[in-house]
C-alpha cells in the first residue's frame, strides 16, 4: 500500500494513512491478529459471560417465550414464520430458532438429571 498524501487528485489522494498492523505475540511466534472490523459477529469470552449473566437475571422476551411454546409442541415451521416476522430476516429467525431449541434441550437434560 503506497503512502497517501493530502492531494485532491491522483491515485494517492486523500488523507495520509499507514497500514494497520495488528500483531499478537504468542511465546516466540508472531501471529497476525484480526482487524477490529473483522471481529464483527465473533463472540468473545467476556461478551458470552455478560450475555449469559443478563439472560439469567432478566429471562426471555415475550416473543421468545411464545416461540419456545411453539417448539415444545413441534411447530418448528410456525415458530420460524413467527420469528421471521419479529426479527425481520430469515437467517436471523433460523439462528434464533436454533438458539431457543438448544435452550429447550438443555432444560430437558437438566430435568432428567434432577429426577
From Swiss-Prot:
GO molecular function list: structural constituent of ribosome
Pfam families assigned: Ribosomal_L36e
Keyword Phosphoprotein: no
Keywords: Cytoplasm, Ribonucleoprotein, Ribosomal protein
Gene Ontology, cellular component aspect: cytoplasm; cytosolic large ribosomal subunit; cytosolic ribosome; nucleolus
Primary location group: cytoplasm
Entry keyword Ribosomal protein: yes
Location(s) in or outside the cell: Cytoplasm, Cytosol; Cytoplasm
Gene Ontology process terms (BP): cytoplasmic translation
Domain of life where this protein originates: Eukaryota
Subunit composition and interactions: Component of the large ribosomal subunit.
Protein purpose: Component of the large ribosomal subunit.
PANTHER family: 60S RIBOSOMAL PROTEIN L36
Family: Belongs to the eukaryotic ribosomal protein eL36 family.
Name listed for the protein in its UniProt record: Large ribosomal subunit protein eL36
